[in-house]
Curated annotation (Swiss-Prot):
GO BP annotations, alphabetical order: antibacterial humoral response; innate immune response
A Gene Ontology molecular function term of the record: serine-type endopeptidase inhibitor activity
Keyword annotations: Disulfide bond, Protease inhibitor, Repeat, Secreted, Serine protease inhibitor, Signal
Cysteines engaged in disulfide bonds, as pairs: 34-62, 41-66, 49-61, 55-70, 81-109, 88-113, 96-108, 102-117
Gene3D superfamilies named in the record: Elafin-like
The species this protein was found in: Chlorocebus aethiops
Function field: Putative acid-stable proteinase inhibitor.
Domain WAP: 27-73, 74-121
One Pfam family of this chain: WAP
Localization terms from the record: Secreted
Signal peptide: 1-24
Record protein name field: WAP four-disulfide core domain protein 5
């Protein structure tokens, strides 16, 4: 009975270590996404982190102002944003900044003239 318990525990640990890969996340990568980065580039600032595991609790290692830093993560809805093949002729105008700004299943996606709420691409 003891050997069976040890084998079961070993199998559970092996499967558990593969869960991030199965669900599309790297080991140490936290749930959620990075907030939109609309700030100007600060090229002389060194990265404050390289991966999520270096950030406290609910923060993720994200690009902000062209360098990586620990920032509060945002929720991300399922699906991917559709490709936009247009070029913008007017000033950039963001109608949203994160998925939670959009109703229902819509995602906050980059478009030719800024970000707006769109239905996820089918695929």
């Amino acid at each position: 009975m003891r050997i069976q318990s040890l084998l079961l525990l070993g199998a559970l640990l092996a499967v558990g270590s593969q869960l991030p890969a199965v669900f599309g996340r790297k080991k140490g990568e936290k749930w959620g996404g990075c907030p939109a980065d609309d700030g100007p580039c600060l090229l002389s600032v060194p990265d404050q982190c390289v991966e999520d595991s270096q950030c406290p609790l609910t923060r993720k290692c994200c690009y902000r102002a062209c360098f990586r830093q620990c920032v509060p993560r945002v929720s991300v809805k399922p699906g991917s944003c559709p490709q936009d093949q247009l070029r913008c002729l007017s000033p950039v105008n963001h109608q949203c900044h994160k998925d939670s700004d959009c109703s229902g299943k819509k995602r906050c996606c980059h478009s030719a003239c800024g970000r707006d709420c769109r239905d996820p691409a089918r695929g």
